Design a protein with these regions (language model features):
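Short terminal alpha-helical segments
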Residues: 1-31
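Alpha-helical repeat scaffolds in large eukaryotic proteins
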Residues: 13-20, 34, 58-61, 85
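Amphipathic alpha-helical binding modules
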Residues: 52-91
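Short, well-ordered alpha-helical segments
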Residues: 42-56
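Short acidic/histidine-centered micro-motifs embedded in hydrophobic/aromatic stretches
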Residues: 11, 32, 52, 56
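Amphipathic alpha-helical segments that form the core helices of the histone-fold
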Residues: 31-39
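Short runs of predominantly hydrophobic/aromatic residues within well-ordered alpha helices
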Residues: 5-8, 46-50, 73, 77
Length: 91
């Protein structure tokens, strides 16, 4: 797995593990998400990844209000992480 993909997958796993139940937790989540959003293009400008990753990084307020959307986005991210890890096990 290339360094950029490893960075992204690790950060997504970390973001998925952060608490997300109160307004202050959502605000803290956004702060971490913004850091990732800054670092990705700075460190890995050519990294390609699914468009849904940006929605995940930007839509925490919607996930906080809509449990169905939260489940959908979290599943999209865990599926992406699993797919990337599986592809690299085979390679």
């Amino acid at each position: 797995m290339d360094e950029g993909t490893q960075f992204l997958v690790t950060e997504l796993e970390r973001l998925l593990s952060l608490p997300f139940d109160s307004k202050s937790q959502v605000e803290a989540w956004y702060a971490e998400s913004k850091r990732v959003q800054r670092e990705l293009p700075e460190r890995f400008p050519d990294l390609e990844y699914p468009h849904e990753v940006w929605h995940f990084l930007a839509d925490a307020d919607i996930r906080a209000r809509d449990a169905g959307y939260r489940q959908y986005q979290e599943k999209m991210m865990t599926d992406y992480i699993r797919r990337v890890r599986d592809e690299n096990r085979v390679a």
